[in-house]
Amino acid sequence: MGSTNYFIHDTSILDKNVGIGRGTKIWHFSHIQSGAIIGENCSLGQNVNVANNVKIGHHVKIQ
């Protein structure tokens, strides 16, 4: 995961210790909580909340 080749909208919140995979897009007003891991090439839509320590695989779309 350590790549910074992803997009996070300015209105989204990332807590400490999150992993974001390459090519992932996180859109408006989303919140990624501490310890969450998001795989590569994912799309997290508006207002998505990913709780603490949740793991999301590759190529997942959440709206």
Show which residues each predicted segment covers.
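Left-handed beta-helix
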Residues: 9-10, 15-16, 21-22, 27-28, ...
